[in-house]
Design a protein with these regions (language model features):
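Rhodanese-like catalytic fold shared by cysteine-dependent sulfurtransferases
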Residues: 1-8, 14-74, 80-81, 108, ...
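Short beta-strand segments
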Residues: 11-12, 97
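Active-site-proximal structural scaffolding
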Residues: 76-77, 186
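A charge-rich, low-complexity, intrinsically flexible signal that marks solvent-exposed coils, linkers
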Residues: 88-90
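A short beta-strand-loop structural module common to alpha/beta enzyme folds
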Residues: 93-103
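A charged, amphipathic interaction segment
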Residues: 136-209
Length: 209
């Protein structure tokens, strides 16, 4: 069964008649549809992230964004795809290729390069590509900023930035040894980052007991 969440696009909308009517229509079409309590206004009031559209890449005929980066990812080239799929484009495609092939693949497949050493989506000073994406897309919420510090420390060997940096580095290197296929590695790492984000959001002050 298909799943859908309907939310009014009007910034002042409270998830009223239009949302509930559309959800009912979708349920009649055999979709599992829900409405967001409070609508767009409720989302904003709760200070949930809103993606800035000005840096969104061009989408393909199926509505997907396509990204390309260097093969054999470890930290950033896994963390950024996680961020994109969870907060920007859940259908995004990622192409992992040899460093010398990144630009050619980007041109041929209309893909957006990231973490390649040059271009817009790359490290800037002490900020890694993950930091750049948070800022450019307007996703600088407290949980994601906490996660960014962990990612930055693991990626740059500044393991003193947060106690969790060493753990993320160890788990990431372990995954890179477990999987020869980059997409399989990315898919396996998604749950790792899901758990780490959930800790950043809800459980940072909780103990194992």
């Amino acid at each position: 069964m298909r799943r859908a969440l309907w939310m009014c696009g009007n910034p002042s909308a409270d998830g009223g008649t239009l949302s509930r009517g559309a959800a009912a229509w979708l349920r009649d079409d055999d979709a599992q549809a829900e409405t967001l309590t409070g609508g767009f206004a409720g989302w904003v009031e709760a200070e949930h992230p809103l993606v800035r559209p000005e840096h969104l890449p061009v989408r393909d005929a199926l509505g997907r964004t396509t990204w390309v980066t260097r093969a054999r990812p470890k930290i950033i080239r896994v963390a950024c795809p996680w961020l994109i799929r969870r907060f920007i484009d859940p259908t995004a495609r990622f192409l992992f290729v040899a460093p010398t092939e990144v630009q050619g693949v980007a041109d041929r497949f209309k893909a957006t390069p990231f973490d390649t050493g040059h271009g817009f989506w790359n490290d800037r000073g002490e900020h890694c590509t993950f930091d750049v994406m948070l800022s450019a897309f307007g996703l600088e919420t407290q949980p994601l900023l906490r996660l960014a510090e962990i990612v930055r420390g693991a990626d740059t060997d500044r393991l003193d930035l947060a106690p969790q940096c060493a753990g993320l580095l160890a788990a990431s290197l372990g995954l890179s040894r477990m999987y020869r296929d980059d997409i399989a590695q990315l898919n396996a790492a998604m749950v790792l980052y899901d758990g780490l984000f959930r800790w950043c959001r809800d459980a940072a002050d909780e103990t194992h007991g």
